[in-house]
């Protein structure tokens, strides 16, 4: 069944929401895309297709810059403003019931962390959190992850050049409220080698199980 597409006005222009509703929802999960991809990223689509049967309505928000056909994302403040407006508007919909969780892939996870408290989220799902640019570990974004102020689930590939699980663990230290899950052999896009012992099917199952438990549990 195709997602329902909704237009959402924001201070940064119109964005789009792709809604996959649960029949008897207990939670709402709003997900954002990365700077280099859209709402059709494999992991975002996986969650949108499979979580509703667990009672979780999934909404994938397309930022206005991408809706407008631009290739480059705007500054973080503009992303946060558009996201906050969209999530706030969505919460007013009659089908948006249950506890609110936010999250996203890569840059979308950063936005979700920065705005979690402002939108009243119960938790944040981080898919491939970009701790730093490849080869630039000194430019850490750990403060965004650590400062979310709500429980966080971080799913990170062991071969992610934007930050390995070990790097994220080091940045976390003993900070409470963060569950870090390593995806063996996966890169930033959650791709694994065909011959890997931890297969693509294993990865999808792990992602679904972890997010389903975090949001629906």
What are the residue ranges of the model-derived segments?
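Serine-hydrolase catalytic machinery in alpha/beta-hydrolase-like enzymes
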Residues: 5-99, 187-198
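Short alpha-helix in the alpha/beta-hydrolase fold that links the catalytic acid
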Residues: 44, 138-141, 150, 163-172
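The conserved SAM/SAH-binding core of class I Rossmann-like methyltransferase domains
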Residues: 61, 127, 155
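Primarily recognizes the serine-hydrolase "nucleophile elbow" in alpha/beta-hydrolase
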Residues: 83-150
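Short beta-strand/loop motif that positions the catalytic acidic residue
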Residues: 147-149, 154-156, 160
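Acidic catalytic loop of the alpha/beta-hydrolase fold
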Residues: 158-162, 188-189
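Catalytic histidine neighborhood in serine/cysteine hydrolases
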Residues: 174-191
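Catalytic active-site module of serine/aspartate enzymes centered on a nucleophile-bearing elbow/loop
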Residues: 194-217
């Amino acid at each position: 069944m195709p997602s329902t597409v909704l237009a959402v006005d924001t201070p940064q222009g119109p964005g789009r929401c792709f809604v996959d509703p649960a029949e008897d929802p207990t939670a709402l999960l709003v997900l954002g895309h990365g700077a280099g991809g859209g709402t059709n990223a494999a992991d975002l689509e996986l969650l949108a297709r499979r979580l509703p049967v667990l009672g979780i309505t999934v909404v994938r928000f397309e930022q206005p810059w991408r809706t407008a056909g631009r290739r480059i994302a705007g500054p973080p403040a503009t992303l946060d403003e558009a996201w906050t407006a969209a999530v706030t508007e969505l919460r007013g919909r009659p089908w948006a019931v249950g506890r609110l969780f936010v999250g996203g892939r890569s840059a979308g996870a950063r936005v979700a962390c920065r705005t979690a408290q402002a939108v009243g989220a119960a938790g944040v799902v981080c898919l491939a959190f970009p701790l730093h640019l490849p080869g630039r570990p000194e430019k850490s974004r750990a403060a965004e992850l650590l400062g979310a102020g709500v429980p966080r689930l971080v799913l990170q590939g062991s071969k992610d050049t934007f930050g390995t699980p070990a790097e994220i663990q080091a940045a976390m230290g003993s900070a409470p409220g963060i569950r870090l899950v390593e995806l063996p052999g996966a890169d930033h896009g959650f791709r694994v080698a065909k011959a890997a012992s931890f297969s693509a099917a294993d990865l999808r199952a792990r992602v679904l199980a972890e997010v389903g438990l975090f949001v629906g549990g």
